[in-house]
């Protein structure tokens, strides 16, 4: 196809060349030119033919090379596929061999199982025969035993069960006692560690109890101005504050007496302002008392907020904050209740951290545990019950309310938090120096404790120990049984509660001792 095209092109070129040549030269030279053109055309045709042959050969060689290469690639692909097929065949062959082995093992196991089953059946039959034989022998032996012992089988079984039961109870009692002693020793040791750590890490201040306040005067002449004409000033001051003013021979001093420390503080501040101002008359007294009351209320609120801030306790109702501040002016057995509440809160927090419970909740319960003492002279009832009612009223959680209620056994403590508050309260109130009483009052209280204990029948002796926080009552084992000793302890506790006034709680410990004496001769 390519050769034909080339020849056609050459022929056309030759014809064109001849045409132009014929039109430009003389006719004479036309023959020569034609001849030359023909020769040139023939030469070009030969060159074209040779070139076409060359091209054809090259194309043929190229086509053959491509065919050879394609065939080689196809052969390689076939070879790879054959290899893959051989690998698959080997795998299949291995799987078949494995399956054959497994089938052989299964068949062997089935045969073994069949043999074992046959063996078990034979053994079962043998055991059944032996069991029947033993049963007959047992019946014979039982009949002989019943004949010899004079007891039936059920009676003998009952006797054996009773004996075993008594022995088991005895062993169990010994084991329980050992476990209880071990647990008690461990618990006591851990409790002492926690309590000692809590006490060591906190040392609070305390303020001695006072029912009077002393206001210094610049001179004794001021006493007359305080009394006023016909005593009108002193009457106005007492009426406005509810506090008694005692003006006696004490030089340059006026004594304010009253059981309510808040009102006493208002009276003290008012009197100091009046003395400093110099204007003392009923109208001015009422004005100054009103202003002093506002200042005391503000100081109470600030004291409550400071306590909550120092402990890191937040979200307390404003009314409870005020009640906490009022505890600053409340004391119990010479111990300031505000400082006591802070101390209990810190001790609760330390012990809670040691036990791994909520520290903030423990501090909150400790701070609020004596909340009722802020108003116990205004509301009837135990300060623990009053405090729990106030906490419940102002949105404290049930756990906090229960801890307040239970810290003096008005409610049985049923949570770790309640027990912590109870322990911290006892630690704060009972530590040396926290509370003070007159020596006569102290001795009288101990005498009263022992007198109440010895008033019961069967008591041989009694001892008031632990600074009056425990009474040990020794009773005669001939006149008082174990059950009666429990009742006696409860009766003594009730009589102490009815006849005595005391801080914290008193442990009544009734001890009954039985001695067995025998002589070896």
UniProtKB/Swiss-Prot annotation:
GO terms for cellular component: plasma membrane. The chain crosses the membrane at residues 3-23. Keywords: Cell membrane, Endonuclease, Hydrolase, Membrane, Nuclease, RNA-binding, Transmembrane, Transmembrane helix. PROSITE patterns: HD (PS51831), KH_TYPE_1 (PS50084). Residues 211-271 form the KH domain. Its EC number is 3.1.-.-. GO terms for biological process: mRNA catabolic process. GO terms for molecular function: RNA binding; RNA endonuclease activity. It is a single-pass membrane protein. Residues 337-430 form the HD domain. InterPro entries: HD/PDEase_dom (IPR003607), HD_domain (IPR006674), HDIG_dom (IPR006675), KH_dom (IPR004087), KH_dom_type_1 (IPR004088), KH_dom_type_1_sf (IPR036612), Ribonuclease_Y (IPR017705), RNase_Y_N (IPR022711). Its main location: membrane. It is found in: Cell membrane. Endoribonuclease that initiates mRNA decay. Belongs to the RNase Y family. HAMAP family: RNase_Y (MF_00335). This is Ribonuclease Y. The lineage of its organism: Bacteria, Pseudomonadati, Thermodesulfobacteriota, Desulfuromonadia, Desulfuromonadales. The gene is rny.
